[in-house]
Amino acid sequence: MASEPNLRYPIEETGDRGPPGPPGPPGPQGPPGPQGPPGPQGPPGPPGPPGPPGPPGPPGPPGPPGPPGLPGLFVTNLLLGIIVLLLLIIVALLLVSKLVVN
């Protein structure tokens, strides 16, 4: 029985090999790779528009006091008034005495 040929696995006949067959179809796409690291930070954006104007400020402190009044001017005017009044009285008396003499 040992001399019986094994029909399951036939013996390959020797001879010239034929040309290679065409390449097979491409394989299926592989699974996606892991997520890459985050990219570098982008440049800063342009400046924003100017904001609205602020509310009006509080009122300022009161100003310094004014210069002192001039009481001397009042006294001078009073004295000048009295002198002019006396001169008018003198002139009136002179006129009256001149009229009485005539």
UniProtKB/Swiss-Prot annotation:
Q: Where is the region Disordered?
A: 1-72
The record's listing under Pfam families reads: Collagen
Q: Name one GO cellular component term.
A: host cell membrane
Start-end of Pro residues biased regions: 19-70
| Cytoplasmic side of membrane | 1-72
Q: Which UniProt keywords apply?
A: Collagen, Host membrane, Host-virus interaction, Membrane, Oncogene, Repeat, Transmembrane, Transmembrane helix
The record's subcellular locations are: Host membrane
Does the keyword Nucleotide-binding feature in the UniProt annotation? no
Q: Which GO terms describe its molecular function?
A: extracellular matrix structural constituent conferring tensile strength
- Additional info? Saimiriine herpesvirus 2 transforms T-lymphocytes, including human, to continuous growth in vitro. Two viral proteins, Tip and StpC, are essential for this function. The virus induced transforming activation is used as an important tool of T-cell biology, including HIV replication.
What protein am I looking at?
Answer: Saimiri transformation-associated protein
| Naturally occurring in which organism (per UniProt) | Saimiriine herpesvirus 2 (strain 488)
